């Protein structure tokens, strides 16, 4: 897709787009799973790293930075601790990727049929926001399960994926699967809109540049777009994680002192009052480390998979 700078929305059949999007999400998730676990652990940590007095009566671990957190997890929980929550996350990424790319393609094609075309960046923003919002809502229960498993320490809150679904449904009801969903949609809509608008703007010019880092213009455009969009909406991502672990099991995760939060605005206000503005950006560094390669891997895998599927279709037609 890089060659010639054609747009993401113009290529592939619906089946090819769904399959390529799903595979891209699967590969990307597996590669960045350890960084995702580290990010979640840092986001759920409420005590101040610069104030030793806040560490009193803290029964859980005190993480300081990406590398030291990763080492602590390996030391206390083994190497597999870095892939906690990977099963629901893989399911989420596959479904998310398929819904996202299909919705993006469908929306942009619909916008192209309007009597008066919107400016290209506006079309990309609308399509990206629609794709992100729908994909987030459709896969949110899996996102919540991913967070809860990643937040487990050596004491297991849930013994298995099926057990977690059963327990949440029985104790918290259907609404329990959607804790923090409003923050997620509020985060992902502008994030995906900004991501795709930036990505589509950068791709044509980067497609003609030789010897780019990360192998291709698609990957570099995806990385730059992800970093810019992720930084802008990160506080809502942190709020989402804090809300996802609310409920009767709140005190049983790796950080046992997570406060009780009630809604997005209450969570934002409480974090600002007790932890300051910096509290809204805990885990941002590792989030950017994760977001950039994740988006680069996602877009590169999507492009290459789509190209391979199209080549297979052409070859099959020739054999007929």
Swiss-Prot record:
Where is the chain membrane-spanning?
17-35, 91-107, 125-145, 180-197, 219-239, 283-300
**Which positions does the entry assign to Solcar repeats?**
12-110, 119-205, 213-308
Alphabetical keyword list = Membrane, Mitochondrion, Mitochondrion inner membrane, Repeat, Transmembrane, Transmembrane helix, Transport
Q: Which domain of life is it from?
A: Eukaryota
Q: Name one Pfam family in it.
A: Mito_carr
Disulfides per UniProt? none
PROSITE patterns in the record, alphabetically?
SOLCAR
Name the SUPFAM superfamilies on file: Mitochondrial carrier
Q: Is Ribosomal protein a UniProt keyword of this protein? A: no
Q: Transmembrane helix among the record's keywords? A: yes
Q: What does this protein do?
A: Mitochondrial transporter that mediates uptake of thiamine pyrophosphate (ThPP) into mitochondria.
The molecule here is called Mitochondrial thiamine pyrophosphate carrier 1
Q: Which organism is it from?
A: Aspergillus terreus (strain NIH 2624 / FGSC A1156)
């Amino acid at each position: 897709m890089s060659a010639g700078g054609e747009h993401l929305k113009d290529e592939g059949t619906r089946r090819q787009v769904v399959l390529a999007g799903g595979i891209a999400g699967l590969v990307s998730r597996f590669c960045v799973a350890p960084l995702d676990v580290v990010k979640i652990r840092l986001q759920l940590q409420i005590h101040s790293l610069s104030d030793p007095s806040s560490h009193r009566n803290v029964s859980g671990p005190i993480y300081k930075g990406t590398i030291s957190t990763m080492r602590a997890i390996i030391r206390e929980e083994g190497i597999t601790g870095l892939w906690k929550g990977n099963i629901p996350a893989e399911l989420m990424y596959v479904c998310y990727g398929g819904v996202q790319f299909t919705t993006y393609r469908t929306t942009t094609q619909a916008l192209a049929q309007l009597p008066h075309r919107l400016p290209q960046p506006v079309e990309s923003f609308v399509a990206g926001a629609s794709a992100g919002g729908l994909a987030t809502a459709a896969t949110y229960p899996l996102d919540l399960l991913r967070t809860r498993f990643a937040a487990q320490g050596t004491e297991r809150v849930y013994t298995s994926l099926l057990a977690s679904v059963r327990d949440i449904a029985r104790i918290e009801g259907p609404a329990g699967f959607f804790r923090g969903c409003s923050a997620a949609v509020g985060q992902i809509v502008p994030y995906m809109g900004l991501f795709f608008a930036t990505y589509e703007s950068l791709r044509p010019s980067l497609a003609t540049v030789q010897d780019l880092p990360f192998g291709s213009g698609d990957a570099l455009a995806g990385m730059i777009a992800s970093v810019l969009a992720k930084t802008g909406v990160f506080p809502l991502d942190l709020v989402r994680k804090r809300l996802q672990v609310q409920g009767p099991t709140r005190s049983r995760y790796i950080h046992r002192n997570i406060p009780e939060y009630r809604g997005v605005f209450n969570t934002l206000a409480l974090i600002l009052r007790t932890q300051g503005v910096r509290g809204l950006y805990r885990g941002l560094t590792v989030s950017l480390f994760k977001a950039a390669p994740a988006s680069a891997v996602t877009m590169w895998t999507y492009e290459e998979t789509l190209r391979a599927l199209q080549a297979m279709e052409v070859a099959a037609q020739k054999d007929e």
